[in-house]
Every structure is written in C-alpha cells, then in structure tokens.
C-alpha cells in the first residue's frame, strides 16, 4: 500500500543562469580550479553527537551528529593521503571553503568509528571506513538509502593512475558492502543507487539480488569532458529499488514539475491541462525517468564544493521527496561533501552519512550549519520543481503565492 502525503515548503530561490556563455565560463573556471587542486584530509577524532546549528554567527554543539564512508580499496590505496592548497578565488565565487578555525570547530561535530560504537543516534556525520562501522548502525532503521558509490572507471589520483576492475571484480566489490547496507533499510523502505554507463549493468545485477528494481532514472549532466574516439559521457543513471514492491512509499505529487506552455491547447475556449496566468501559461507535469533540468554545481552556487563528483541538491531533493516523508530517516554510506545529509535536513528528514575522507566530512559539516539559515534548494520553490532558466517565473510564482497566503490570513 502506497503512503501519500502533502506538505508545504518554504520559499526557495534558484541559482541557475539563463546566459549560456556565462555558465560555460563558470564551468571552465571551476574545471581549471579543480585541476590545480590537491584534495585534503585532516587527522584526529571527533567527539560525535552534535546538532548542526549556528548561533550569533558561531557554530555551537547542541546534541546531534552525522557522516559516511566506504572506499574501493583497489582504486585508492590507503597509503595515499590528500592535501589541500589555498586558492585565489573570484569575488563572486561561492564555493564552500574552510578556515583553520572552522576546521577545528567543525571537527568536533564529526563522529568517528569509536564514538559510533558508544551509541548510534540520528543525524550523524561519521568519518570512517564504511566496512569498519556499518555493523554498529542498527538494522531496519532507515526509510530510504541514497548511494553514490565509486564508479568502475580509470582514475588519476594525486598523479597516480588506477585501472578499472573487470565487471566480475566490481560486482564482488559491490556485494562486499551492499548486502550490509540493505540490512539497514526498513522492510517497506526504498533505495536509490547511482552509476554511469560502464558500471550501471553491474549495479543492476547486484541490486536485484536483494531488492526489486522499480525503475532506472537517467539524468543529463551539462558537464563532461569531450572524447576524440568516443561519445562524450554526459549522462548518469540512478536505479530505484524497493524491498517490498507491494508496500513502499512513493509520492508523485511531491515532485511535480511546473513548465511553461508555448503552444497551449484549448477545448471549447478553456485551457486543457494547463493554467492561464498573467505571467504566462503553465502546466504541472508528472516527472518521467529522464531528467534534463538538473544543473551540476559550479562556482557561483552556494552548494558548490571542490568535490570532483558532487551531486546537485536538486537531484537528491527529487529522490527524497518522492520516497520519504518528513521525519523519515535517510542513509548515505558514501556521503562525499554531504549533499544527501544537507537536503534531508532542509526537507525535515533525519540523516546518517559515512565518509572516509575527513576533508569531505568538514565540508558536509559546514553545509549542514549553513542549512539552518538557508533552506533553499536550487530549482525548487514552494513545493514545485522548475525547469532550467526559469528563475524569473519561479520568483513571480513564489511571490504571488506568499501574497495570497497573507490575504487569506487577513480575512
């Protein structure tokens, strides 16, 4: 039986630009910055159990925590460490950065494997290897898991090249942790797992060993490097699976897309499946399994970090809104820079994430602090998703909705 719900959402703003040339230049600058960057990691252990809040511009600890982990051992050897360098950034660059004082303060908000053994709690960022701590997380605890594992690709890391595994080896690697993650999901829970064209078939085979695959979402990245002897890779897949196909939550009404209608169709002079407004004609459309409205974070967006494979908040917002309800628990065993945790917090869900790289955990912690003051999600406003380059339409829509609510309250 499907559970349905309706929720109102706070005002948000969209960070997309309508000028393609500016967006292209932004992407080029970010790529240049990333190519010059050496990733960093810290040392030391956090105390765990901290709430992500900001008070009087200072980070305070009030009782929660959260993180994520797991790394493919063959591709990233343990003896390779990450380092950071200071960058000169443009004045409008909003990429998340850390001062030394922030590193020290945020580090106290991050849990580790030892603090997890002392007791699990919701809203933790755990700086640890997933395989070393996953058994300390309770079974059947999470309503939804979002997984963005290492893809089976050739990589250059700190100047060293690592080769991809065979499909059989990669599937063995997936089984090594996927079965354990499945145990953490409730009997009526759901899962989304990301992959690219090369590893998506392996992911499907392993997922189907434990869960029922319901669909495959393909989303378009406007980024991607060109290739001389192959097609440019600008698409990624997200597999949607559930434990029980007869009992899971999916709320399509929470992920509707508002699109402008360029050629409206009328029946006897009345709008057909669209709304006529002073600002134009719009239609509420059901989401398909192909998404071309997602912007990959770049330097002028508040959510942007230096993580090389950061997922957009808008992308995860669709997954979380469709397959969970406020108060539900979200697990991300490969947290990265914290997108799943941040979006879960903005949408009033609990989270737990594991990440092996301390630098990424610190970025996630800062983003969680910022989410207290800014709950906006690019491309999502007042319970509605918007297509690319529709910032003006979205702002008008939100403003009129707000004015309408004020009039009703005054009556």
Where are each of the predicted segments found?
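Intrinsic disorder/low-complexity segments
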Residues: 23-24, 37, 43, 69
């Amino acid at each position: 039986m499907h559970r349905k719900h309706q929720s109102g959402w706070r005002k948000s703003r969209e960070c997309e630009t309508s000028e393609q040339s500016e967006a292209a230049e932004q992407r080029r600058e970010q790529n240049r910055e990333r190519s010059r960057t050496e990733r960093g990691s810290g040392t030391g252990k956090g105390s765990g159990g901290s709430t992500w809040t900001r008070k009087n511009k200072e980070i305070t600890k009030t009782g929660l925590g959260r993180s994520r982990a797991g790394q493919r051992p063959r591709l990233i050897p343990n003896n390779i460490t990450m380092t950071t360098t200071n960058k000169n950034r443009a004045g409008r660059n909003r990429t998340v950065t850390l001062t030394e004082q922030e590193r020290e303060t945020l580090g106290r908000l991050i849990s580790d494997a030892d603090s997890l053994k002392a007791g699990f709690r919701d809203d933790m960022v755990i700086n640890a290897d997933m395989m070393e701590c996953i058994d300390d997380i309770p079974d059947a605890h999470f309503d939804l898991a979002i997984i963005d594992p290492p893809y089976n690709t050739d990589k250059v890391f700190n100047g060293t090249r690592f080769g991809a595994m065979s499909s059989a080896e990669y599937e063995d690697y997936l089984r090594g942790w996927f079965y354990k993650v499945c145990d953490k999901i409730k009997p009526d829970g759901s899962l989304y797992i990301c992959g690219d064209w090369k590893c998506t078939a392996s992911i499907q085979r392993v997922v189907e060993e434990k869960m029922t695959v319901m669909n495959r979402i393909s989303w378009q990245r406007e980024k991607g490097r060109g290739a001389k002897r192959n097609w440019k890779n600008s698409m990624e897949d997200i597999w949607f699976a559930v434990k029980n196909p007869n009992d899971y939550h999916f709320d399509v009404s929470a992920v509707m897309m508002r699109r402008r209608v360029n050629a409206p169709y009328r029946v006897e002079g009345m709008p057909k499946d669209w709304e006529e407004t002073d600002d134009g004609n719009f239609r509420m459309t059901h989401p398909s399994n192909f998404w071309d409205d997602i912007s990959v974070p770049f330097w002028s967006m508040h959510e942007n970090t230096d993580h090389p494979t950061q997922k957009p908040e808008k992308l995860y917002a669709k997954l979380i809104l469709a397959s969970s309800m406020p108060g539900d628990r979200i697990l991300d065993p490969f947290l990265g820079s914290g997108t799943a945790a941040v979006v879960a917090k903005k949408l009033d869900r609990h989270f737990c994430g594991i990440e092996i790289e301390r630098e990424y955990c610190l970025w996630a912690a800062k983003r969680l602090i910022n989410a207290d003051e800014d709950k906006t999600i690019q491309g999502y406003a007042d319970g509605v998703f918007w297509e690319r380059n529709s910032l003006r339409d979205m702002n008008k829509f939100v403003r009129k909705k707000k004015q309408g609510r004020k009039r009703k309250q005054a009556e």
